[in-house]
A protein has these predicted regions:
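Non-catalytic beta-strand/loop surface segments
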Residues: 1-45, 67-105, 138-192, 216-266, ...
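Active-site SXXK
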Residues: 51-65
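Divalent-metal coordination cores built from histidine and acidic residues
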Residues: 107-111, 126
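A common structural junction motif
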Residues: 113-122, 212-221, 333
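Zinc-dependent metallopeptidase catalytic helix centered on the HExxH motif
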Residues: 268-270
Length: 333
């Protein structure tokens, strides 16, 4: 049991015999229960030739499971007044339900079903590839998305974080259902998952139900430990600071500068979070007051510590007019 110093509540964390971690937090303020099933595998765990497979799998689980045909999953959740979603990040994939408290078991069962029993129909996969490629192309039309992808590709070059979560059209098109099944077998193991349940629940009842639902699942292979990258060795030896300019049909200039920093596994990450907030976290921050209000060089500016599991990037972004880029950059550097 872990006490939360901010809320005064206690979070109950239990590891089941098969290695599944279960975190339960009772919160009676609302008649709701949020359930999340985290899989410790995202785009940073992919091979270069299968870039985007985590995101493709996230899409495919909505196409049906062994016990719930296509569209039945969302219909079942929504008809009970709930919400269903999923998301892919660099370091994890998460399956999400928010339910009225009387239907919390359904929420847990649905995330279990999606993670462990997706149908993965080949025809559905080919159809969904078109949807994902269209999503990728829309991202290319968005200056912020395009800038962030380019920024990480250069700042974290030589690490798995230099690839976009969504992957590339070539790698997406090449994926097969067998690729997805192999990926599931490698990473979708209880020992590599965290089940989180928060809301108006009895923790003992939730734990008992989790043990019942997830006990049948066994681990299929040992997990390889991954080590953090040394931020002070990036960019890689021999490389030089990069300047990337990408023209586009926009009236403004979207500028970003970044350098590699330690990831979330380092104590320094919290220090960098504070520094980022002081420099450019909101309208009262140093950079915002200096470059937006005093010098009037930018329309907006922000600073963030983009922290991943094994590495991070300290990022300054700004939106400004083209004729103000040079004086802004000179002042910043």
């Amino acid at each position: 049991v872990i006490p939360d110093p901010l809320s005064g509540k206690e979070e109950q964390v239990t590891k089941l015999p098969n290695g599944l971690s279960v975190l339960i937090l009772k919160d009676t303020r609302f008649p709701l229960v949020s359930t999340r099933l985290y899989v410790h595998a995202g785009s940073s765990y992919e091979t270069p030739d299968q870039a985007g497979i985590s995101h493709v799998l996230e899409h495919m689980v909505f196409k049906g499971t062994d016990s719930r045909p296509k569209s039945a999953i969302s219909q079942e959740v929504e008809s009970a007044g709930g919400y269903l979603n999923a998301a892919t990040s660099y370091d994890y994939t998460v399956y999400i339900t928010d339910m009225p408290d009387r239907h919390w078991k359904l929420g847990m069962d649905v995330v279990r079903d999606m993670a462990f029993h997706p149908t993965l129909d080949p025809q559905e996969l080919e159809s969904e590839k078109n949807v994902i490629v269209a999503e990728l192309q829309r991202g290319e039309d968005d200056p912020g998305s395009r800038m962030f992808k380019t920024l990480l590709a250069d700042t974290l070059k030589g690490t798995p974080y230099d690839r976009p979560i969504i992957g590339y059209e070539k790698t997406i098109r090449a994926l097969t259902t067998q690729n997805l099944r192999d990926y599931i077998a490698k990473y979708y193991q209880p020992q590599n998952m965290l089940l989180v349940v928060v809301g108006n629940v009895d923790p003992a009842e939730v734990l008992a139900e989790a043990e019942k639902m997830f006990a049948p699942y066994k681990n299929t292979a040992p997990l390889k430990e991954v080590m953090p990258y040394e931020a002070d060795r990036l960019p890689l030896p021999g490389s030089k600071p990069a300047l990337v300019v990408q023209p586009g049909p926009w009236n403004k200039v979207y500028l970003a500068a970044a350098l590699p920093v330690p990831g979330s596994s380092s104590y320094q990450s919290a220090t960098l979070d504070v520094l980022a907030y002081l420099l450019g976290g909101d309208r009262t921050s140093l950079f915002y007051k200096t470059y937006k209000y005093e010098h009037q060089l930018v329309d907006s500016i922000s600073v963030s510590n983009v922290s991943f599991e094994r590495i991070g990037a300290f990022v300054v972004t700004a939106e400004l007019d083209a004729d103000k880029v040079e004086p802004f950059w000179t002042s910043l550097t």
